[in-house]
Amino acid sequence: MAWRYSQLLLVPVQLVFLASVCCPGVWGSTVSEELHRMVGQSLSVQCQYKPKEESYVLKTWCRQTAPSKCTRVVTTSEPRKAARELQHTIWDDPEAGFFNITMTQLTEDDSAFYWCGPYYPSLREVTVLRNISLVVSPAPSTLPSQTIAPLPESTATIFMPFPVLTTSPEETTDSSINGTGHRNQSSSSPGWTSPGLLVSVQYGLLLLKALMLSVFCVLLCWRSGQGREYMAETMELSKLPHISKSLDTVSHISGYEKKANWY
């Protein structure tokens, strides 16, 4: 019986594992890749996607300005042609299935969350492929900027794409996010929430539900076992009157035999 209960306890744990494996978009899309640079350095990012033999889809580099929207920094106009906006450059190769973004002469004001992905002008929507957290630190005052050793790139991770609404630098209309929200490190919005905290809360709630389900299953099986034991005891007790009647009959016959022997 104990082994049976332990097997039931494993069911919610297996469900949690399957949810994390089968639905990476739910858990993984809120995780950001943190990249560190110093003032004056450059940043290069590559975003990969599945090549498609359809009409060309624009690609963009988008900076988060609030938990519910982002502003496009630089956007492609056609394949295999570099597009430049200030210190930002983007270049796309649809046949290879990737596009590169370069940011030069970084300043501390460039510290923010950035998204890269396909851009759909009619919907004003970006399908986010990567979520980059850029942290630009001041250069050491004792060393010239050209002697600063470049910091290593973060390991590239492909996330489950999810769409968000966006605005261009000229547009000021507020747009709501259509997917999972992300915070902007440089944003002063009081409603901002850490993605890591949101993930922890989601995991905690899911594990709490799994634990409650486990307790319910154990109690249900325990009550069922108690019911079966009660029925078995009732059946055994119901047989006792027949046994007592049999004993009375045997006792009665023995009495007659004793009287016969006496006569």
Curated annotation (Swiss-Prot):
Residues 168-191 are annotated as: Disordered. Disulfide bonds join 47-116. Predominantly expressed in spleen, with highest levels on selected populations of macrophages, including red pulp macrophages, and on subsets of dendritic cells (DC), mostly on CD8alpha(+) DC (at protein level). Also expressed on blood and spleen Ly6C(low) monocytes (at protein level). Not expressed on lymphocytes or granulocytes (at protein level). The chain crosses the membrane at residues 201-221. Glycans are attached at residue 100. InterPro entries: Ig-like_dom, Ig-like_dom_sf, Ig-like_fold, Ig_sub, Ig_V-set, Immune_rcpt_domain. It is found in: Cell membrane. The keyword Secreted does not apply. GO terms for cellular component: endoplasmic reticulum; plasma membrane. Residues 29-132 form the Ig-like V-type domain. PROSITE patterns: IG_LIKE. SUPFAM superfamilies: Immunoglobulin. Residues 222-263 are cytoplasmic. The keyword Transferase does not apply. Residues 29-200 are extracellular. Gene3D superfamilies: Immunoglobulins. Induction: Induced by synthetic TLR7 ligand gardiquimod (GRD) in cultured splenic macrophages. GO terms for biological process: defense response to virus; innate immune response; phagocytosis, engulfment; positive regulation of defense response to virus by host; positive regulation of toll-like receptor 13 signaling pathway; positive regulation of toll-like receptor 7 signaling pathway; positive regulation of toll-like receptor 9 signaling pathway; protein localization. Positively regulates Toll-like receptor signaling via TLR7, TLR9 and TLR13 in neutrophils and splenic macrophages. Regulates TLR7 signaling by controlling ligand-induced recruitment of TLR7 from the endoplasmic reticulum to endosomes and lysosomes. Positively regulates Toll-like receptor TLR9-induced production of inflammatory cytokines but is dispensable for IFNB1 production. Involved in the anti-viral response to several viruses including influenza virus, vesicular stomatitis virus and cytomegalovirus. This is Trem-like transcript 4 protein. It comes from Mus musculus.
